[in-house]
Amino acid sequence: MGNIQYLAAIPSPPQGVWHLGPVPIRAYALCIIVGIFVAMKIGSVRYQQRGGNPDLVIDAGIVAVIAGIIGGRLYHVLTDNQKYFCADCNPVDVFKITNGGLGIWGAVALGTIAVYFYLKKKGVAFALFADAVAPGIILAQAIGRLGNWFNQELYGRETSVPWALEIYYRVDASGKFAPLTGHSTGEVMATVHPTFLYEMIWNLVIFAVLLWADKKFQLGHGRVFALYVAGYTAGRFVVENMRADDATMVFGLRINVIVSVVVCAIAVGALFALRRGRESISS
């Protein structure tokens, strides 16, 4: 990338991993953990307000987290398989999820499916539950995007805008290039669009919209969840087109762009097709 001088820019963290003795403390993992707790707390409060048992959110949340991690990693590995199964790659890296690489599509899809069957076994209505937890999920996604900032990943094309993000050259203790686990040398490799920040801000906007729309229109029967999916995928479509990292291409488009369009269309259709009004826990 070019050696362009910028008047202002957003610095990346000098590192994304700290060590407590032999134990690595990864910012990416911490952001995900904080997001999970925030989502569970908000979901518990909202589900209780709808007449549900808040403890169920915690139980279902554990199911969702386990399934989400598996689904997210599977989606990432399948759609970015060239990063793990090439001549110079180490397939063992597939299991190093703390280094980053959780596809949100796979996480939400498998997490949702797992929770659906868990609630069905418990005899609990899925739609009411999904509406209660949807705002917390999008807020958790916003928090999780901070992990990409620490990892210096998922950024956009080079730019000279004042809010551009500086990507530092990081090395490990031996001086080898280590973008995820190393420490910054102070050298700026590139100044790019902070797409992680764009998506984080968009997710915060959707969080506010969900709370507002839910209160104003008394949404129910799965419509809050549908609005969440539609809102998130619309923003992801825009952000995905700004990213510069390697991606699997289908018909000349990034695969996540195609997924965004398809899922958004389904969610919008569901939003208008689902029943109006809000159901009670006993209905």
From Swiss-Prot:
Cell compartment(s), UniProt: Cell membrane
- Entry membrane topology: Multi-pass membrane protein
Q: Where is a 1,2-diacyl-sn-glycero-3-phospho-(1'-sn-glycerol) bound in this sequence?
A: R145
Q: What is its EC number?
A: 2.5.1.145
Lineage top rank: taxon = Bacteria
Q: What is this protein's name?
A: Phosphatidylglycerol--prolipoprotein diacylglyceryl transferase
- Give the pathway annotation: Protein modification; lipoprotein biosynthesis (diacylglyceryl transfer)
InterPro entries the UniProt entry points to: Lgt (IPR001640)
Which NCBIfam families does the UniProt entry name for this protein?
Answer: lgt
- PROSITE patterns on file: LGT
Any one GO molecular-function label of the UniProt entry: phosphatidylglycerol-prolipoprotein diacylglyceryl transferase activity
Per its database record, what is this protein's job?
Answer: Catalyzes the transfer of the diacylglyceryl group from phosphatidylglycerol to the sulfhydryl group of the N-terminal cysteine of a prolipoprotein, the first step in the formation of mature lipoproteins.
Concerning its family, UniProt says: Belongs to the Lgt family.
